[in-house]
């Protein structure tokens, strides 16, 4: 059983080391097998790099022929290693300029300080003044002219109703 696993591992590594097909770059034109041997870091950035072949229509503007997405390790930005050295002219291990921007943003995001705990909304205490009803339980005394009698209450109600209907007393 152990020999069978070793044979399978060797076969898989041999196939992945070989580019899938043509001599000018294989499947999609990118050296895919080279990534099988590398130990990838914890963070990789997908970069759009020229593939020089593959896709529909090759390099002549066909579908998928000119560019391909390839993982580029971010550790080259920290260690100064020359991973991806076929792309010269940038300060991040020779990555293409678009990828150099992505790596710089990733470095900023990883180096940014933590925001900490969420802010607690603090309000000033509210001092409400309670309004108490009057404490006197004695019946309120009305004046002599304010006392309403039964007959005058009916007359007052009828005069209010007449005022609403449009009847007015003649004024002199």
From Swiss-Prot:
Keyword rRNA-binding in annotation: no
Q: Which GO terms describe its biological process?
A: chorion-containing eggshell formation
Named from the GO MF annotations, one term is: structural constituent of egg chorion
First-listed, main subcellular location of the protein, grouped into a coarse class: secreted
GO CC field: egg chorion; extracellular region
Question: Where, per UniProt, does this protein localize?
Answer: Secreted
Which keywords does the record carry? Answer: Secreted, Signal
By its UniProt entry, which InterPro entries does this protein fall under?
Answer: Chorion_2 (IPR005649)
- Report the record's disulfide bonds: none
Using the record, list the residue span of the signal peptide; answer none if the entry has no such feature: 1-17
Pfam families, sorted: Chorion_2
Main function: Chorion membrane (egg shell) protein; plays a role in protecting the egg from the environment.
Q: Which family does it belong to?
A: Belongs to the chorion protein S15/S18 family.
Q: What is this protein called?
A: Chorion protein S18
